[in-house]
């Protein structure tokens, strides 16, 4: 696997994913009973946007960088999810430096309560070691494991309620999307009361439309598509 999220951390797609993640957890927090959060591709848990990788891509400049540069008056009037997101980023930067940026596991643990639990997968050994170094929370169980088989082994959790964040690297999209549909069908069958959030890149609109049609044909209830496009579909 060649994918390294350190090149893409904090970009516009990360911003959208993390704001939505926090909003989903907020909804789960509305009920008293505990829940389980599962992250299938946890990554390093925390990133440094001052590294050569992040600086080389510069993707964060059109993501988190633009938000933190906004006037405080604009931030105060932003939607609740955006305010919560920015507060977590600001707190991390106060503790780890202005280049620090949280990964999905970090955002999730900040959005969860003490009674909730997390299961986080990461199969790349070097990235998993970074995850172990960065995430030291008693609520989180870390697994160096392929989530495509690991997810089905840990659901349904004893908490009954919960959220699964699925964010694979999509290195071979023609293979990854069909595999993702199969995973979701199997996971939903085991845990029909779970919430499954799937992140995917929009590089080939026709491929995305095929994926979405296949998902609707699965019969999985209450599907919602949330997309953000900052460039036209025909942009090279």
Model-derived segments and spans:
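Class I S-adenosyl-L-methionine-dependent methyltransferase catalytic core
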Residues: 1-236
């Amino acid at each position: 696997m060649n994918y390294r999220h350190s090149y893409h951390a904090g970009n516009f797609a990360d911003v959208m994913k993390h704001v939505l993640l926090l909003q989903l957890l907020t909804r789960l927090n509305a009920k008293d009973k505990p829940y389980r959060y599962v992250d299938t591709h946890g990554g390093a848990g925390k990133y440094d946007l001052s590294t050569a990788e992040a600086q080389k891509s510069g993707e964060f400049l059109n993501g988190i960088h633009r938000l933190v540069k906004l006037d405080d008056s604009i931030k105060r009037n932003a939607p609740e999810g955006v305010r919560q997101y920015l507060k977590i980023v600001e707190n991390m930067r106060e503790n780890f430096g202005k280049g620090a940026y949280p990964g999905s596991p970090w955002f999730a643990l900040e959005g969860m309560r003490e009674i909730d639990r997390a299961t986080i997968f990461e199969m790349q050994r070097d990235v998993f070691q970074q995850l172990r170094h960065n995430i030291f929370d008693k609520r989180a169980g870390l697994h160096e494991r392929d989530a495509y088989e690991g997810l089905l082994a840990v659901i349904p959790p004893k908490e009954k309620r919960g959220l699964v964040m699925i964010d694979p690297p999509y290195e071979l999209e023609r293979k990854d999307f069909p595999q993702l549909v199969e995973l979701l069908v199997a996971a939903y069958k085991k845990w029909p009361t779970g919430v499954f959030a799937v992140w995917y890149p929009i590089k080939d609109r026709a491929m995305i439309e095929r994926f979405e049609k296949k998902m609707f044909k699965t019969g999985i209830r209450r599907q919602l598509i949330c997309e953000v496009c900052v460039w036209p579909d025909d942009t090279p």
